[in-house]
């Protein structure tokens, strides 16, 4: 996806420190202080323009949400949605997923969402996929024993790759759908991409998984 550069995005984000956390590493192990409560924390990696994460925060006030998007020119759109939604349980962070452990303590995150991640179709880019074992290792450290990963995509190849990656990592697949919008699943909140692709008739794939720990 080609992103239009917005040179003013960084300044705009920093105008709202109650929503945008400029230096998330300062709060490693202390995110409950940021939210002012002990509610569980869910993160979305690759939040894009923020429709999903704002919707989740609105629908579930008893859960704290953090939207993570490394491109500030994209994250500024998520900021606008957060402001409009008036959700006190949402924060936004501009960081690369590879650096998550700099900002979160072991077991500090209750749930992770991966929605319509870049499929990186070329074989030489496999390690960049957010469901690659390198990233699964990071997620395993951040999640508690019962923590889950929820993954959605319109890309069948990425979905199949992810199913194999999760299984080979000995994760438990607790939910799998090859056509989410025509399933019995309730409570789905759509992303911008999801609306776009489903409107064109493409099936949406979804899975839920957790790490198999003793």
UniProtKB/Swiss-Prot annotation:
An annotated Gene Ontology molecular function: tRNA (guanine(46)-N7)-methyltransferase activity
Residues binding S-adenosyl-L-methionine: 44, 69, 96, 118
Function: Catalyzes the formation of N(7)-methylguanine at position 46 (m7G46) in tRNA.
NCBIfam families: PRK00121.2-2, tRNA (guanosine(46)-N7)-methyltransferase TrmB
InterPro entries: SAM-dependent_MTases_sf (IPR029063), tRNA_(Gua-N-7)_MeTrfase_Trmb (IPR003358), tRNA_methyltr_TrmB_bact (IPR055361)
Record-listed E.C. numbers: 2.1.1.33
Top-level taxon of the source organism: Bacteria
Positions that bind substrate: 122, 154, 191-194
Pfam families per the UniProt record, alphabetical: Methyltransf_4
Catalyzed reactions per annotation: guanosine(46) in tRNA + S-adenosyl-L-methionine = N(7)-methylguanosine(46) in tRNA + S-adenosyl-L-homocysteine
Catalytic residue positions: 118
Originating organism: Listeria innocua serovar 6a (strain ATCC BAA-680 / CLIP 11262)
Family per record: Belongs to the class I-like SAM-binding methyltransferase superfamily. TrmB family.
Lineage: Bacteria, Bacillati, Bacillota, Bacilli, Bacillales
Keyword set includes tRNA processing: yes
GO cellular component: tRNA methyltransferase complex
Pathway: tRNA modification; N(7)-methylguanine-tRNA biosynthesis
Name of the protein: tRNA (guanine-N(7)-)-methyltransferase
Keywords: Methyltransferase, S-adenosyl-L-methionine, Transferase, tRNA processing
